[in-house]
Amino acid sequence: MLLQGDEYNLKELNGRIVLFGGNSTIYPEEYVEIDKQNTNDKFIVAEVHRDIKQIKKETEKREEAAIYAVIIYKRLSDNIINRMRARDIRECLNHGEEEKALNCIVDCFDNSIYSIDYEDRMKISLIYAGDKADVKFGGEYLAENVTLSRGYVVFYNYCEKLQYISSFYNEIQEKLNFDMSREQVLRLYILGRYVKEPNDNGSICENDKNV
């Protein structure tokens, strides 16, 4: 199973499969849905917030649609942040202990998760800019020109997320046969966007569609 039984609710609403959290039995305001299109045999995966729908993926493969839906749902619902450690990071910086604050972060992860002061597209990258910091992943900013306190906490939080989804990807790769690359899964979870393979102009991102 991609999700544990107590992690989610799964219901059929108006002909669509709806995945949502909490114990509510009424129609949720925020959810992920899979809609089977009878006209073209495609499955459409969408993220819905208060009736605003963002289409994340269109595919003819049922299993691929299910995997996309699960990753999007986990991105919305998972709470994996260690708030006590984030507080410790801030306290170190408040006392001028920048190196200790950084060690408090990197000691939690191996170096496949992060890079310091240079950008690696497949890692969470902390880049110094004077007394400010940028945090990037996949060529995109997670935080730009923020204070070190803010930058370090964002850096730590996203390292946690990347470590978590990397482990999840390895787990589902062992259980399932699917076509999504590691980069696609990681970017979908971290950035919330579907990623195509590179095309002739080098673009790999497909914009979400609002409905």
For each predicted feature, which ranges?
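Surface-exposed polar/charged interaction patches
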Residues: G5-Y8, I72, H95, C108-N111, ...
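A short, exposed loop/beta-hairpin motif centered on an aromatic-Gly-Thr core
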Residues: R50-E63, E140-N145
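A short, charged, amphipathic alpha-helix used as a generic interaction element across diverse proteins
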Residues: E60-Y73, R150-K161
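Short aromatic-glycine-(Arg/Gly/Cys) micro-motifs in beta-strand/loop hairpins
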Residues: N23-Q54, I72, Y128-G139
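Long, terminal "pre-/pro-" and other extracytoplasmic accessory regions
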Residues: I55, E63-K74, N79, N177
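Negatively charged, low-complexity tracts enriched in Asp/Glu with abundant Ser/Thr
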Residues: M1-S24, R75-K123, Y128-G130
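A eukaryote-biased signal for long
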Residues: S125-V211
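Long alpha-helical, hydrophobic tracts
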Residues: M1-D6, V32, K56-A65
